[in-house]
Regions:
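Nucleotide-activated donor-binding/catalytic signature segment of Leloir-type glycosyltransferases, i.e.
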Residues: 256-275
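Aromatic "clamp/platform" in nucleotide-sugar-dependent glycosyltransferases that forms part
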Residues: 292
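Nucleotide-sugar donor phosphate/pyrophosphate-binding loop at the beta->alpha transition
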Residues: 127-130, 138-159, 197
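N-terminal subdomain of nucleotide-sugar transferases
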Residues: 1-60, 238, 376, 382
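Conserved acidic donor-binding segment of nucleotide-sugar-dependent glycosyltransferases
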Residues: 326-334, 342-348
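Short hydrophobic beta-strand element within catalytic cores of glycosyltransferases
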Residues: 309-312
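Conserved donor-binding/catalytic core segment of Leloir-type glycosyltransferases
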Residues: 4, 168, 207-225, 231-235
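Carbohydrate-associated surface elements
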Residues: 173, 194
Length: 382
């Protein structure tokens, strides 16, 4: 099959899940490429806005061809930026098919706006499209306001869902959560994100031998990630006399504002790359995430794949609640989180079993085979 992946956002703003699925499908022998237009924001990263290429180009990442462009977004002009982005992707697709021919299927990551442009391309070229949905309810609320909402974007995205051959939420719970905006009149089935389980493989942790129990957290500095809960929870545990450390990484965690929140035993590194995330996990005894809203956070999968247990809040999906591998606490519960962290210190962990559980449903082989079969079935019905 010839499969074209279209992410709504990509490097330098995340979207690695698109690359991982492309790699999984390519490893099964399919022709897979990524078409990516990234809208840059001057307030998000001025250096990227000014210095990233101004022309379209192809490059390779992990043996996957990416047809890339960057759009300079204009502040406070959301509608203009969206329609310009859609126009650029449509133009890039014209270039793409001149070189590679029409794909058999389009795979959009997030309805906003890759799913919408996939719908437009489907109408123009007679191609089926599938949407994998990653965005959380809280991220939609930040843009549309709480439901019911009359935001102009909603009818466009609702139509993209309804006309898709299939919508693949990365958590079953997401369908009900976002129904307040888009309803449920579309075809869907749950499919996990992919993580590179060969890269994030099991690794035996050294004996503590009196060293501190090391928690880590890999999350950007934002309200949604709950650092205002995690930091005081850790302080309570540390002040009680527990021999613990907390190592933090993520965009914005190296700023003066964030580091002023830290206390004894806490360290933050800012944004780190994939290899550094793995090293941090290998050097840690458990991962903790105090999020207020999530769909399927990849870092939980990555942590458990390496063999460490996780502590997370009740917003994470059932699919990530691995027996023996995850402890769930209420959202915004500082005391509950601190107690769970304390209990984790003395907990026996079957690390290999946790790792194998993740490989079973989130490995490239497992997800790639399910995706490929779904795509074949859709194409056969055209």
């Amino acid at each position: 099959m010839h499969i074209l992946e279209i992410p709504s956002f990509f490097t330098p703003y995340g979207g690695e899940f698109c690359l991982e699925q492309a790699k999984a499908l390519k490893a099964l022998g399919h022709e897979v490429r990524i078409l990516s237009c990234v809208q840059l924001g001057v307030t998000i990263g001025l250096k990227d806005y000014l210095l990233l290429p101004y022309h379209r180009y192809e490059h390779q990442r992990d043996d996957v061809t990416i047809y890339q462009s960057f759009q300079r977004g204009l502040p406070k002009m959301v509608h203009h930026n969206v329609m310009r982005w859609v126009s650029i992707v449509e133009s890039m697709f014209c270039d793409y098919i001149k070189k590679y021919g029409k794909p058999d299927i389009l795979h959009a990551h997030c309805a906003k706006w890759a799913g919408y442009v996939a719908m437009q391309l489907s109408k123009a070229y007679g191609l089926p499209y599938v949407i994998t949905e990653h965005l959380s309810l809280m991220s939609l609320e930040e843009e549309f306001g709480k439901a019911p909402s009359d935001a102009w974007q909603i009818p466009f995205l609702k139509q993209a869902y309804e006309q898709a051959a299939m919508v693949l939420p990365v958590a079953e719970e997401l369908v009900e959560e976002i129904a307040c905006y888009f309803g449920k009149e579309y075809r869907w089935q749950y499919l996990s994100n992919v993580i590179d389980t060969d890269f994030f493989h099991y690794h035996k942790r050294p004996s503590r031998n009196g060293r501190p129990f090391r928690f880590c957290c890999v999350a950007d500095y934002s309200y949604r990630k709950g650092y205002d809960v995690l930091i005081p929870a850790y302080k309570q545990l540390h002040d009680s006399g527990a021999n613990v450390e907390l190592i933090i990484a993520g965009r914005g965690t190296d700023t003066v504002k964030f580091r002023n929140l830290l206390s004894e035993g806490m360290t933050s590194y800012g944004l780190i790359d994939k290899a550094a995330v793995r090293e941090l996990l290998y050097e840690s005894d458990a991962l903790v995430l105090a999020s207020r809203s999530e769909v399927q956070p990849l870092v939980l999968l990555e942590a458990m794949a390496t063999g460490i247990p996780v502590i997370a809040t009740s917003c994470i999906p059932q699919s990530l609640r691995i027996e023996g591998g995850s402890t769930i606490v209420p959202i915004d519960d500082i005391k509950g989180l601190s107690l769970a962290m304390g209990q984790m210190i003395g907990q026996d962990t079957d690390s290999k079993t946790i790792s194998e559980s993740i490989r079973h449903f989130a490995s490239p082989e497992a997800v790639g085979m399910k995706l490929a079969q779904l795509f074949r079935d859709i194409i056969a019905l055209r």
